Each structure stands twice: as structure tokens, then as C-alpha cells.
């Protein structure tokens, strides 16, 4: 590449970057987080939210999509932590395939036809039971939804499908979502495997992704 073409490319790239910075995002917002880079540890989204004393969700009715993997680096579960905050009201817990606590999911109490979490008193909804979407009546009670779950890094997991359905429902009800991210356990650097055909799209292949999606 000649020097002239290289300079033109750099200028174009710079203008594209400036335009992207000015436009930012239409539906998303950037939240300032504490600088923890001086610690030689991994901090998940839940750890960061705890560092901010959960200010983003205080004085709000929240729904949480999680399972047993939603723990801090000190192995404290999100439901145990938030259950101690009087100014955070957990209205609903959305559980994925296998439930909140895996196959041994007997901790929720059955009161009438409703399942209740004994720690927070929140109503529990399994997104794989009957309807793949949460009920409209509970969505109308929520101010924000928090998602914290460790995915597997492969397409066959239904977690990403349930999250997508939750996003679709939240969009219909104009409810903001906070995603507490976690690292890909099989790393996000490698992509492997074929793409599914559209005619075979299912809940185990809701998105047209390779088996190992990165």
C-alpha cells in the first residue's frame, strides 16, 4: 500500500471513529465503573455492581434472570446479597433451564399456584414452562431487569435463547436491562463448528451461530 493510500485510510478510519463517538448509542448507556485494574483479580459484572453499592437498582422493582452461577468472587449469590438491601425490591426471579439451583431446585416454596423464593419473597418464573416469555402482568410491575448467568460458550445452551426472549419482552414493555457479564469459560477467542440451517432453527439453535460461538 502506498503512503498516500495509507494516509487516506487512516483519515477515513479516524472520521469513522469520531462519528461513532459522537453518536454513541441510541438505546444503550455507558455507566462509569470503578477502576480496579490495579488488582490482579478477575471482577465480573456482579462484582462491579457490588463495588458501586448497587446504586443502579436501588429504589426500583427489579426482575433477575439467574441461576446458581450468579456469585461474586467471594462466592456470595446475588439473591443472598440483594435480599439484605431494604431499598431494592426483587419482584420476580426468572430461571433458565434446570432452574435456579440446578436439578436440585426445591428451595422455592409453592404457595397456591405460585413459586416463591424464601430469601427474597420474589415470585419465581421458569422461562421454559408453557410460555417462553414471562407473563405480561409481572413485566408491568418491573422497573429494570438484571441478567447474571454463566453461559457455556456453545450454541446448544438454551441460556442465550431465554435471554433473547427476555430481551424481546423487555423491549415490548420498555424495560431497561442490565447485563452483568461473565467471561466465556472456553474463551471467546476461538470460533469453531458449522452454522445451523434456518429450517432447523430451534430453541437449542435460536441464533444462527457456530457451535463454539466465541
Show where each model-derived region lies.
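Glycine/threonine-rich flexible loop motifs
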Residues: 151-163
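A short helix->loop->beta-strand "cap" motif at the edges of active sites that frequently abuts
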Residues: 87-88, 172-176
Amino acid at each position: 500500500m502506498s503512503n498516500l493510500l495509507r494516509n487516506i485510510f487512516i483519515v477515513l478510519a479516524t472520521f469513522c471513529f469520531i462519528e461513532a463517538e459522537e453518536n454513541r448509542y441510541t438505546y444503550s448507556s455507558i455507566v462509569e465503573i470503578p477502576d480496579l485494574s490495579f488488582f490482579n483479580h478477575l471482577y465480573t459484572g456482579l462484582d462491579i455492581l457490588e463495588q458501586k453499592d448497587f446504586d443502579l437498582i436501588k429504589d426500583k422493582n427489579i426482575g433477575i434472570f439467574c441461576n446458581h452461577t450468579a456469585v461474586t468472587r467471594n462466592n456470595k449469590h446475588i439473591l443472598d446479597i440483594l435480599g439484605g438491601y431494604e431499598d431494592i425490591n426483587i419482584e420476580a426471579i426468572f430461571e433458565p433451564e434446570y432452574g435456579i439451583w440446578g436439578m436440585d431446585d426445591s428451595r422455592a416454596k409453592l404457595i397456591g399456584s405460585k413459586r416463591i423464593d424464601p430469601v427474597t419473597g420474589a415470585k419465581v418464573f421458569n422461562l421454559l414452562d408453557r410460555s417462553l416469555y414471562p407473563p405480561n402482568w409481572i413485566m408491568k410491575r418491573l422497573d429494570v431487569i438484571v441478567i447474571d448467568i454463566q453461559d457455556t460458550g456453545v450454541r446448544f445452551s438454551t441460556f442465550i435463547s431465554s435471554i433473547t426472549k427476555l430481551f424481546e419482552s423487555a423491549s415490548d414493555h420498555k424495560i431497561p436491562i442490565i447485563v452483568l457479564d461473565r467471561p466465556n469459560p472456553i474463551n471467546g477467542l476461538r470460533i469453531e463448528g458449522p452454522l445451523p440451517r434456518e429450517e432447523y432453527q430451534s430453541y437449542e439453535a435460536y441464533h444462527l451461530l457456530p457451535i463454539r460461538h466465541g
